[in-house]
């Protein structure tokens, strides 16, 4: 692989000057698409501010090596763009770093000259996803501001990582499932299998249930949700002899990867412990790191963020329970499944935040959309039909993207 270190000879400011074309692409996307679909200027301003984040994260807020896998994606995209690694070879080779790099290499950007370059690639995906959700009328006032201001999302969508791709494919899989467009939903969940198979196995049964129970039109129903939960619990108990060794393997691997010693990890020894650990670790995974567990500036910031996010989740869930418990039940199943799966195997606080934010974002987006959550505090019931003077787009006035 060719030497990429030449960029460091240009210093801090020189490195960032090379990224100005990428910044311009992102800003032009906001201006052109925002103008076409008459997106309110306050949303466009926040998106434009997001475009500046790649400049002020790596080697400003923290060292690039703090999340060292950024170098691997940077090198992977460069290898593909330079022809040292074939695109098909990267996509089919089995290494999910190269598979994610192959997908990023398709984006209309200059070659990534520094580790911060892919932050603009991911910012581009973040902006594209925003406009798709906006034009498809997925957003409510609550979810649109959560999307724009969620700190973890702002952080990870501006770094040179695969997390934005994961979020992008997961959200669009659900979007097309809600529209009963099976082929498009499958099209977006397949790349997810390549770059993050855990999320694929979390999302696939959820999407399948969405189609089977016609959740978009009928909701899940509390009785169905309880029945599915009991069946799932029974299935876990029956599968315990097979599942426990695999879970222990991943628990140990993740613990060692995060700097622990294999002999210090507490392994799951029985079916009862498996179920209890899954339930309790799911709640802990959603909440950590707590303030007293934070060790360093970034974990401390993330612990304060957790308090805010948990409060928002509580308010959204409470309002959804009051308005549409049948629709809420489905997304509570999604949240319980996803948090429990990762809670069993993830120990590092930073890793937990990184893996958790796409799942939290999906919950907020689609609980607000399916339960029509437009405010967190008012008890007044609003009709589903939007008012003519509402900020968000009306389907009768705006064309839709990728329908």
Q: How should each PLM-predicted stretch be described?
A:
Residues 39-41, 130-151:
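Transmembrane-helix signature of polytopic, membrane-embedded enzymes
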Residues 67-71, 192-193, 201-323:
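Alpha-helical transmembrane segments and terminal signal-anchor/GPI-anchor hydrophobic tails
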Residues 110-128, 303:
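Loop-to-helix entry region of an early transmembrane alpha helix in multi-pass inner-membrane enzymes
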Residues 135-141, 179, 220, 314-334:
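Membrane-interface helix-loop-helix junctions at transmembrane boundaries of multi-pass membrane enzymes
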């Amino acid at each position: 692989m060719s030497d990429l270190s030449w960029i460091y000879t240009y210093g801090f400011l020189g490195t960032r000057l090379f990224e100005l074309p990428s910044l311009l692409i992102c800003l032009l996307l906001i201006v052109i698409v925002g103008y076409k679909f008459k997106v309110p200027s306050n949303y466009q301003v926040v998106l434009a501010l997001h475009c500046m984040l790649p400049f002020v994260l790596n080697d400003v807020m923290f060292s690039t090596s703090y999340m060292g896998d950024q170098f691997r994606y940077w090198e992977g995209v460069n290898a593909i763009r330079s022809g040292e690694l074939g695109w098909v070879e990267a996509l089919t080779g089995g290494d999910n770093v190269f598979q994610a790099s192959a997908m990023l290499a398709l984006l209309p950007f200059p070659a990534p000259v520094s580790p911060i370059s892919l932050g603009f690639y991911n910012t581009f995906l973040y902006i594209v996803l925003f406009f798709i959700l906006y034009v498809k009328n997925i957003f409510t006032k609550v979810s649109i501001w959560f999307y724009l201001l969620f700190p973890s999302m702002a952080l990870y969508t501006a770094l040179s990582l695969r997390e934005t791709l994961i979020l992008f494919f997961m959200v669009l899989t659900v979007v097309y499932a809600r529209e009963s467009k099976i082929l498009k939903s499958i099209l977006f969940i397949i790349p997810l299998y390549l770059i993050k198979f855990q999320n694929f196995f979390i999302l696939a049964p959820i999407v399948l249930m969405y189609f089977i129970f016609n959740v978009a039109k009928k909701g899940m129903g509390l009785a169905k949700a309880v029945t599915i939960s009991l069946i799932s619990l029974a299935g876990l108990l029956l599968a315990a002899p097979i599942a426990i060794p695999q879970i222990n393997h991943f628990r140990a691997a993740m613990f060692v990867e995060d700097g622990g010693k294999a002999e210090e990890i507490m392994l799951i020894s029985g079916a009862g412990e498996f179920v209890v650990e899954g339930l309790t670790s799911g709640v802990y995974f959603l909440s950590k790191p707590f303030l007293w567990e934070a060790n360093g500036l970034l974990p401390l910031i993330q612990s304060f963020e957790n308090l805010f996010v948990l409060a928002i989740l509580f308010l959204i869930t409470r309002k959804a329970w009051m308005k549409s418990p049948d629709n809420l039940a489905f997304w509570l199943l999604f949240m319980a499944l996803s948090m429990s799966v990762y809670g069993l195997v993830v120990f590092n606080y930073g890793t937990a935040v990184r893996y958790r934010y796409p799942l939290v974002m999906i919950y907020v987006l689609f609980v607000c959309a399916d339960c029509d959550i437009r405010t967190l505090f008012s008890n007044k019931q609003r009709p589903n039909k939007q008012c003519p003077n509402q900020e968000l787009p009306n389907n009768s006035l705006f064309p839709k993207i990728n329908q």
